[in-house]
């Protein structure tokens, strides 16, 4: 692929991630639409096509773009327009559905069974309201993800707090392993 085509395709991928599918890429945008470059690169690196993308590539992508679609400031990036879903993820405590789902690679299962779900490089653990969404997120990490089911009722009884993310995503600080099961569906 020639360089111009590479940067055009990268711009489309970054736009999709920042404007329309933060939930799929597990990105946490602030109230002004900014996300850390580190978090975006981590999400992009889940795909073989974007595994080698570096901050320098994002800078070149922005410079070469005819239309200014993205802005890079310090170690944060944002899309300048065209968002189809709300940008702000407000940490507002809420009562989630009885079960939430998390898609991940089978290689992480032993650690999750021992230690539960933790946010890793993010601020929160991301959980989906439905299995399909969890599977889409999980497929960014593994072609054949496992879907974990979180019993939110029992977790809330033990003090786990859940926060509203957006229409598809709930957030939590962490989920202890006793509230997690493998979804068999």
Curated annotation (Swiss-Prot):
An individual GO BP term: tRNA splicing, via endonucleolytic cleavage and ligation
Alphabetically ordered keywords of this record: NAD, Transferase
Database matches in InterPro entries: Ptrans_KptA/Tpt1, RNA_2'-PTrans_C, RNA_2'-PTrans_KptA, RNA_2'-PTrans_N
Molecular functions per Gene Ontology: NAD+ poly-ADP-ribosyltransferase activity; tRNA 2'-phosphotransferase activity
Job of this protein: Removes the 2'-phosphate from RNA via an intermediate in which the phosphate is ADP-ribosylated by NAD followed by a presumed transesterification to release the RNA and generate ADP-ribose 1''-2''-cyclic phosphate (APPR>P). May function as an ADP-ribosylase.
Recorded family membership: Belongs to the KptA/TPT1 family.
Protein's name according to its UniProt entry: Probable RNA 2'-phosphotransferase
Organism name: Bacillus thuringiensis subsp. konkukian (strain 97-27)
Protein's gene: kptA
């Amino acid at each position: 692929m020639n360089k111009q085509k590479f940067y055009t395709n990268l711009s489309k991928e970054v736009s999709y991630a920042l404007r329309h599918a933060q939930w799929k890429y597990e990105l946490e945008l602030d109230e002004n639409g900014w996300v850390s470059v580190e978090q975006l690169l981590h999400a992009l690196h889940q795909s073989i096509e974007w595994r080698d993308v570096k901050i320098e590539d994002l800078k070149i992508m922005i410079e070469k773009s005819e239309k200014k679609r993205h802005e890079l400031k310090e170690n944060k990036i944002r899309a300048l327009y065209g968002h189809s879903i709300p940008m702000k993820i407000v940490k507002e405590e809420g009562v989630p559905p009885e079960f939430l789902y998390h898609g991940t690679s089978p290689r992480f299962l032993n650690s999750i069974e021992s230690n539960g779900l933790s946010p890793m490089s993010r601020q929160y653990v991301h959980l989906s309201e439905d299995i399909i969404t969890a599977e889409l997120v999980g497929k960014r990490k593994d072609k054949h993800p496992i879907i974990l089911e979180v019993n939110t009722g029992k977790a809330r009884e033990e003090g786990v707090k859940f926060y509203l993310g957006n229409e598809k995503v709930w957030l939590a600080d962490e989920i202890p392993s006793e509230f997690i099961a493998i979804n068999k569906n």
